[in-house]
Amino acid sequence: MTEIQKPYDLKGRSLLKESDFTKAEFEGLIDFAITLKEYKKNGIKHHYLSGKNIALLFEKNSTRTRAAFTVASIDLGAHPEFLGKNDIQLGKKESVEDTAKVLGRMFDGIEFRGFSQQAVEDLAKFSGVPVWNGLTDDWHPTQMLADFMTIKENFGYLEGINLTYVGDGRNNIAHSLMVAGAMLGVNVRICTPKSLNPKDAYVDIAKEKASQYGGSVMITDNIAEAVENTDAIYTDVWVSMGEESEFEQRINLLKDYQVNQQLFDLTGKDSTIFLHCLPAFHDTNTLYGQEIYEKYGLAEMEVTDQIFRSEHSKVFDQAENRMHTIKAVMAATLGS
C-alpha cells in the first residue's frame, strides 16, 4: 500500500477570504491539491477525515460547489450533510450565532454558501470548528484555489503570470482574483467599464498584497491594453444571482467586453488559456439562453461558443479542480 503524505497543516483554521492566508499557505494548499488529484487518479485512498461529520449550508443554489464538497468529504472518509435554504434559518427564525453554536456541537466542519460575508464570519466566530466559505457576495476563496491550481497546471508556475479578468469588476470573482492573484505574485488586470469598477476598498487590499508579495493590479476599460501579452483570460456571467432584473442594463454595458476570437487575437499569443467559474452563457441551450436570445437577440453573452469549446478553454479542468482544492482545504484544516 502506498503511504500517503501527511496533510498540509492548517489545523483548526477557517477559510473565509483570501487575505486570511499568506502566500506560502495558499501555495501550500494548491500543491497539496495537486497531490490529492494524483491520489484520486491512481486510486490511492486518503481518508484524512475518517469519522468526521461535515455540514454543507447552502442559501444559494449550486452545482459545482455542492458536488465538490460532497465528493471531497466522501473521498476523505467524512460524512457530508446538506442543509439547504429551507433547512437553515440564518438570521430569520434563528440568529447566526445560535445556529453556529448548535452546528458546532454536532459537526466537525461547516461549509457556507450564501449572500452575507458577515454570516460566514459569524459562523466561524461562534461554532468553534473550521468554517469554509463556498461563496458570498464579497469573496469566493475556494474558487480561487481551483483557478490558480489550473493556471499552475498549464504553465508550471504562478509568479509573473499575466491574468486578465474581463467583465463586471464589482463581483466576488473580480474581488477574489485581485487579492489572491496579487498575493501569489500574479499581474492581475481587471478590464471593465468605468461604471463597474471594483470598489476602492477591494482594490486597496489587492494593492497591499501586491506590494507585499510582488504581484500587480491594473483596473482599466481599455480591452487592448488589458489583454496584451496575457497568459489567461477569465470572465464570469454578466448578471449575478439576485440581479436578474438588470440583464438589459448589463448587456448594454458589457456587450463590447465579450470574450471572443477577436479579443483573443489581441493577446498576441497562442498559449493564452480561457477560464470561467461557470455556469456560462455561451449558447442558447438553456432556458436563460433562449430567453436572452428572444429578448435581446444575443445567442452568446460573456463568451462565444467558439472560445468556450476551443483548445484555449480549461473550464472543465477548472471545475474538476474545485473538488481537489476543496479537499485540500478540508484535510489541511481538519485532518490528522
Swiss-Prot record:
PROSITE patterns: CARBAMOYLTRANSFERASE. Pathway: Amino-acid degradation; L-arginine degradation via ADI pathway; carbamoyl phosphate from L-arginine: step 2/2. It is an enzyme of class 2 (transferase). Its main location: cytoplasm. It catalyses: carbamoyl phosphate + L-ornithine = L-citrulline + phosphate + H(+). L-ornithine binds at residues 172, 236, 240-241. GO terms for cellular component: cytoplasm. Keywords: Arginine metabolism, Cytoplasm, Transferase. Pfam families: OTCace, OTCace_N. Its EC number is 2.1.3.3. The keyword Cytoplasm applies. It comes from the Bacteria. GO terms for molecular function: amino acid binding; ornithine carbamoyltransferase activity. Carbamoyl phosphate binds at residues 62-65, 89, 113, 140-143, 277-278, 322. GO terms for biological process: arginine biosynthetic process via ornithine; arginine catabolic process to ornithine; citrulline biosynthetic process; L-arginine biosynthetic process. InterPro entries: Asp/Orn_carbamoyltranf_P-bd, Asp/Orn_carbamoylTrfase, Asp/Orn_carbamoylTrfase_sf, Asp_carbamoyltransf_Asp/Orn-bd, Orn/put_carbamltrans, OTCase_ArgI. Reversibly catalyzes the transfer of the carbamoyl group from carbamoyl phosphate (CP) to the N(epsilon) atom of ornithine (ORN) to produce L-citrulline. This is Ornithine carbamoyltransferase, catabolic. It comes from Staphylococcus aureus (strain MRSA252). The lineage of its organism: Bacteria, Bacillati, Bacillota, Bacilli, Bacillales.
